[in-house]
Amino acid sequence: MAVFHAFRALRPTPEKAADVAALPYDVVNREEAKSIGDENPLSFLHIDRPEMDLEPETDLYDDRVYEKAKENLDNMEEKGILVQDQKACYYIYELVRKGKTQTGIVGCSSIDDYMNGVVKKHELTREDKEQDRIHHVDSCNANTGPIFLACRYPDSLLTLMNNWKDHHEAAYDFTEEDQITHRVWVIDEDEVISEINKEFAGIDSLYIADGHHRAASAVKVGLKRREQNPGYTGEEEFNYFLSVVFPYDQLCILPYNRIVKDLNGLTVKAFLGALKFNFELMLMPGFPCRPVEKHCMGMYVDGQWYHLKAWPDIYEKKDVVGQLDVSILQEKVLRPVLGIEDPHTDQRISFVGGSHKAAELAEIADRTGGVAFVMYPTSMEDLMKIADENKLMPPKSTWFEPKLRSGLFIHKL
C-alpha cells in the first residue's frame, strides 16, 4: 500500500512557467548551466545550479553555493514569480514528445515507503552526490526537483486523470525549444483528492525510474528532521518527498551508450578477435548501426560500424541482471577486454544518453582512437523485475526521455 500525499506546491505563475522550467540539475554541466542562466534570469537552474551566480573558481560544494540557492529561491518567491498554493492539491503533469504522451500525478511520497521497500530502487547511489543534495535540500528547506516514479496504474486512476483533464483548463501549457510540450492541471477538489489517496493505497509498489540520489537525499533529510523533532506526528512535510508517478507503460527509455577512449593497448585486429568468442560480428559498412532487438548492439571502431549479437550461451536467461545488455557488455567486453573494472570511477569510459545521434558517438571515439557502443534500451519490465528482486542494475543502464522539468513544483518542508 503506497502512501501518497497532496501538498501546497510553490510554483510559477502561469505567464512565467515556461521561463522558470529547467532541465534537471544533473543533465547539464557547469558551463551549460551558466550559458542558460545568463540568457534567462528566471531559469530554475539559478536554484538547482547556483554556482553560476558565483565566481567561476567557486568549488561546487562550497557553503556559498547552497546559500546562494536559498537566496535565489527566496528572491523568486518574494518577487511573486513563485507562489504557494493556498490548499493542498495534486497536480497532473503531461509531457508530449514526438507524438507520444506520458501523463502522471504529482504529489509527495512517504519516506517510510522508501525505507520499507514500497518505493523500490534499482541503482546504487554515491555518497558525495547524496551529501550535495542533502545540503541543497536542507539549505532551501524544500525538495526542488521531483523524483520520477512509475507504477502499474489501475484503470480507474487513468480514468480519473482523463476526466479531470477533459473538464478543466490546464494551468500551464507550453512547448520548449526541444519541441517537448508540458501541460499541468491542478486538482483542488477534496473529493477527487480523497479518491486519489484511495487509489494509491491500493498500489503495492512504486518504482524509481530516475532520481535515486535526490530520493535518498530527501529521505535522509526527513530522518534528520525527525531526530531534531522527537515529537513529530508523521504529518509534517519533511516526512514526504516530491514525486511524479507515471504509468510504467507510457514511459520511453532510450539506450545509455558507452564510449571507451582507447583499446587497452590492443590492435583493432586483436580487439575484434577477442570479441568473436562471445559475439557474432557483422561489418555494417556505410552507416551507423543501431540494434533493433535485445542482446544486440552497434559498435564503432577505427572508422567502421559493426553489429554485435551475443551468443546465447554467454548469459543466464533467468538472471534478471546478468541478461541485461549493459551487463553483458560489461562482463564480456569492458572488463576482460578493455580493462574497465569499475565503470563508476574509470576515467576511460564515458556515457552518452540515447538522445544523441550515433554519428556523434563515432566522432567522439575517433578523437582518441577509441570505441563506441550503441546499446539496445533496457525495458521498464526488466527494471521493475530487478527492483522487485531487490537487485541493482549496472550504472547508467537507462536514459529516460523526455526529462521532467524542475521548477514547476517545489515542495516546501
Regions found by a protein language model. Give the residues of each.
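Surface-exposed, charge/polar-rich loops and edge strands
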Residues: M1-L413
